[in-house]
Regions:
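Short intrinsically disordered terminal tails
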Residues: 1-6, 104-108
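Acidic, low-complexity intrinsically disordered segments
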Residues: 47-108
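Generic preference for well-ordered secondary structure
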Residues: 3-12, 65, 69
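Amphipathic, interaction-prone secondary-structure segments
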Residues: 11-43
């Protein structure tokens, strides 16, 4: 029996990127090998302005798991989210939510 201490499992390292999409400040957190080798966990948060609607989340936070190769192919976590946001920004639901938010802003 060895007296050497047991090796603690290394925690996945997080990388945070800040980016802007259509005037909205956001962050993208990328954790590699989250579920196992080759699987990434991405998190997106709306930083400013708080409460502004974005097309892929109603809460300002999004958690997404995907293959690491998909993150690389997109050009990184911020590029992955910006492409997703651009695709979904054309939806009727998003345009309606944005119009409602802008109308409320007039009365602030």
């Amino acid at each position: 029996m060895s007296n050497a201490p047991a090796k603690a499992k290394a925690r996945p390292r997080k990388l945070v990127e800040k980016f802007a999409w259509r005037g909205i400040e956001m962050s993208a957190t990328h954790t590699r090998d989250w579920l196992g080798e080759g699987w990434s966990h991405l998190e997106m948060r709306v930083l400013k302005p708080k409460g502004r609607p974005v097309p892929i989340t109603d809460t300002g936070y999004l958690s997404h798991f995907l293959d690491e190769n998909d993150v690389k192919a997109a050009g990184g976590p911020a590029a992955f989210f910006m492409a997703w946001l651009d695709r979904e920004a054309e939806s009727k639901a998003y345009r309606k939510a944005l119009a409602r938010w802008q109308q409320l802003d007039l009365f602030a």
